[in-house]
Regions:
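Short helix-coil transition/hinge motifs at the ends and kinks of transmembrane helices
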Residues: 83-91, 209-214, 281
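Membrane-associated alpha-helical segments
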Residues: 106, 143, 169-273
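A short hydrophobic/aromatic micro-motif that marks alpha-helical segments and, especially, helix-coil
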Residues: 62, 204, 210-211, 280-282
Length: 319
């Protein structure tokens, strides 16, 4: 069974040395906030070319951080975990974290800045007796699964907004929430598209590593298919958000058109009062008549029209 290690304290270093002496493949996950790259080199004997690739900042274009030299494969991915909340992603439980991955014939290394145990977050299925290629596939598959979970979070947020909007009083959808969802989907799509290019090479390059062989099942082809499905799902979620915006804009245009029709009779009313102003002054000979004709009757008429005609027209006939 593949052994999984987290961190690089004295006990873990001794265990790594023992596993390497026995020729057993293992997965080591560690945080750069707890371990230095020099410690990794001393413990794992990372090749110089792979170390240079690991030193490349994973931010920006993840596909540019890809490195393969026949002895190691280095690339950067993104997964989602429950991390400390940040202001621009308030309301979401899962936060993105960038992970640098190093695959050699002896071990799998995952490196990140956050103090979090990736094996505990991903909990991949690593049954005994499976090949090295399957171990790498299982870890990468679990990382992609967290992206699916994060996408589900966005879709559930949109579903909640639509339900609250349709079942409530027709109030507008919060713009801040839509902006957060749109930004999250855009960032997610950019990273998944980069990962699509990465996974097209990972299967080929890892197959060239010692003891990985070429007779493996097409595990990495499954990852490519999964990335394609993720891109399709992200685009569908973005389209759904666009539909929410369209519905909200249509409702606002609908209300504005109704309000605009209310002002159409004003031309007739002002013209009538202007042409008959002298007659009205002669007829209004008491304070009661002034209040009735000037305030009570117009207000009552407007309220009645609103209640019987305008409001049902805006809200829709419940029958």
């Amino acid at each position: 069974m593949t052994e999984v290690l987290y961190g690089l304290d004295a006990a873990e270093r001794a265990r790594v040395a023992a596993l390497r002496a026995e020729g057993r493949f293992f997965w080591l996950d560690t945080s750069l906030s707890e371990t230095s790259r020099e410690d990794l080199v001393d413990t794992l004997g990372i090749p110089e070319r792979a170390l240079s690739a690991l030193r490349t900042a994973p931010h920006g274009y993840a596909s540019r951080a890809f490195h393969a030299d026949g002895e190691s494969v280095v690339f950067a991915l993104r997964c989602y975990a429950e991390l400390e909340p940040v202001e621009e992603q308030a309301g979401y439980r899962l936060r993105p974290m960038e992970v640098q991955v190093l695959v050699t014939s002896d071990y799998l290394l995952t490196l990140h800045d956050e103090r979090v145990s990736l094996p505990a977050v991903l909990a991949p299925d690593l049954p005994p007796g499976r090949s090295k290629g399957y171990v790498v596939y299982s870890v990468l598959d679990a990382m992609l699964a967290t992206t699916s979970d994060a996408l589900d979070e966005v879709e559930l947020k949109l579903d909640t907004l639509v339900a609250a909007w349709t079942e409530g009083d027709g109030g507008g959808v919060p713009r801040a929430t839509l902006r957060q969802a749109g930004a999250r989907l855009a960032t997610m799509r950019r990273w998944v598209r980069n990962e699509q290019a990465i996974f097209e090479r990972v299967g080929l390059e890892t197959g060239a590593l010692r003891d990985f062989g070429t007779s493996e099942e097409p595990y990495f082809d499954r990852l490519e298919d999964q990335v394609d499905r993720l891109l399709t799902s992200i685009d569908a979620a973005a389209n759904a958000m666009g539909m929410v915006l369209d519905l909200q804009l249509n409702e606002r245009a609908y209300v504005l058109s109704v309000v605009a029709t209310i002002f159409v009779p004003l031309t007739f009313i002002t013209g009538f009062f202007g042409m008959n102003f002298g007659w009205m002054v002669d007829q209004v000979d008491s304070a009661v008549a002034f209040w009735l004709l000037g305030f009570v009757i117009p207000i009552a008429t407007a309220a009645l029209l609103w209640r019987l005609l305008v409001r049902p027209f805006i809200k829709g006939d419940p029958r």
